[in-house]
Amino acid sequence: MSKINDINDLVNATFQVKKFFRDTKKKFNLNYEEIYILNHILRSESNEISSKEIAKCSEFKPYYLTKALQKLKDLKLLSKKRSLQDERTVIVYVTDTQKANIQKLISELEEYIKN
């Protein structure tokens, strides 16, 4: 990624980002929060991560995080369970099949960016 040196660079970068997410919403029906979560899970060393950890690194408001996780669960891209240590904690996890599906999706998005 090139460095943003002035307002013109920032405006151009913002335009490209907005276009990417608009096109992604049309093609995959995924928004920024959902793509962020999928990418975060894919880059994670573990197949399990707490929703609190996702919230901490993303700074998403609880409502948006809950809504995004539920949608991704409904799309069968991830699964959720309650922590055995603390029932209030939601654990997000992916099976090998789900992780492969996420990898395929992220690869398609990255290919779109390159073109």
Curated annotation (Swiss-Prot):
GO molecular-function terms, A-Z: DNA binding; DNA-binding transcription factor activity
DNA-binding region: 51-74
Subcellular location: Cytoplasm
UniProt entry tagged with the keyword Transcription regulation: yes
BP-aspect Gene Ontology terms: regulation of DNA-templated transcription; response to stress
Main location: cytoplasm
Outcome recorded upon mutating R88A: Abolishes DNA binding to the agr promoter
Organism domain of life: Bacteria
GO cellular component terms, A-Z: cytoplasm
Record annotation: effect of changing K19A: Reduces DNA binding to the agr promoter
InterPro entries referenced in this protein's UniProt entry, alphabetically: MarR/SlyA-like, SarA/Rot_dom, Transc_reg_Sar_Rot_HTH, WH-like_DNA-bd_sf, WH_DNA-bd_sf
Induction field: Maximally expressed at post-exponential growth phase. Level of transcription reduced during exponential growth phase in hemB (delta-aminolevulinic acid dehydratase) mutant.
Keyword Secreted: no
Effect of L38A: No effect on DNA binding to the agr promoter
Keywords: Activator, Cytoplasm, DNA-binding, Repressor, Transcription, Transcription regulation, Virulence
Effect of L105G: Abolishes DNA binding to the agr promoter
NCBIfam families given in the database record: Staph_reg_Sar (TIGR01889)
Quaternary structure (record): Homodimer.
Protein name: HTH-type transcriptional regulator SarR
